[in-house]
Amino acid sequence: MEAYKKEFIEFMIECGVLTFGDFVTKSGRNTPFFVNTGNYKTGSQLKRLGEYYAEAIKANYKDDYNIVFGPAYKGIPLSVTVTMALSDKYGIDVSYCSNRKEIKDHGDTGILLGSKLNDGDKVLIVEDVTTSGKSIYETMPIIKEQGNVDVVGLVISVNRMEKGQGEKSALVELEEKYGFKSCAIVTMTEVVKYLYNKEVNGKVIINDEVKTRIDEYYKEYGAK
């Protein structure tokens, strides 16, 4: 496993973003782990988050994009920090774009924030976590309405590797529907493998009991 992936897993633990216990997802599933990206709160945390995304983007995509798009709301600061990291780390100077949930009736009344989308633009979407793919299904029509725009990929922080609308993962379903390449900084398989019986800040995060619960969860909800 690449060093940046290991660092990112520990970073999520330190920020309280990745936790293990008893949770219920938006889709009603009882899950033994939870990813709450709202716990990235400080400037230094957001800076590091953007750098991890930038590393994943550099590892999985060529420089064949000129817009980084973050779906509202969590994707707004994410798209900003990712574009800054791409510039700082790799000298890749691209624009950010996000959408509004509500259209303003004064001032700038457009639905987009940041760069406008024009014919010929190549868009890379950044999202926090995609379980069902709902936000992307809502975002794609907004992007396509702006003109002849090509969405070249989707990058998320953690691939939960769960069933989407069918037996396949939400990411695979999105790839098949829209024809773009998706990737994650880490997958839950990588997370579990790295954290199993490993101490982080003096505490074992995934012991035998937690590992058993995760395995049982994926027997029921894991993507085929």
Swiss-Prot record:
Catalytic reaction annotation: orotidine 5'-phosphate + diphosphate = orotate + 5-phospho-alpha-D-ribose 1-diphosphate
Keywords from the named record: Glycosyltransferase, Magnesium, Pyrimidine biosynthesis, Transferase
Entry superkingdom: Bacteria
Pathway(s) per entry: Pyrimidine metabolism; UMP biosynthesis via de novo pathway; UMP from orotate: step 1/2
Bridged cysteine pairs (disulfide): none
Keyword set includes Glycosyltransferase: yes
Cofactor(s) this protein cannot do without: Mg(2+)
Residues that, per the record, bind 5-phospho-alpha-D-ribose 1-diphosphate: 26, 73-74, 100-101, 104, 106, 127-135
Record flagged with keyword Glycosyltransferase: yes
EC number: 2.4.2.10
GO MF term set: magnesium ion binding; orotate phosphoribosyltransferase activity
Gene Ontology annotations of biological process type: 'de novo' pyrimidine nucleobase biosynthetic process; 'de novo' UMP biosynthetic process; pyrimidine ribonucleoside biosynthetic process
Pfam family, one: Pribosyltran
Residues given in the record as orotate binding sites: T131, R160
GO cellular component: cytoplasm
PANTHER family named among the record's database cross-references: OROTATE PHOSPHORIBOSYLTRANSFERASE 1-RELATED (PTHR46683:SF1)
Family to which this protein belongs: Belongs to the purine/pyrimidine phosphoribosyltransferase family. PyrE subfamily.
Function field: Catalyzes the transfer of a ribosyl phosphate group from 5-phosphoribose 1-diphosphate to orotate, leading to the formation of orotidine monophosphate (OMP).
Assembly mode: Homodimer.
Name this polypeptide is given: Orotate phosphoribosyltransferase
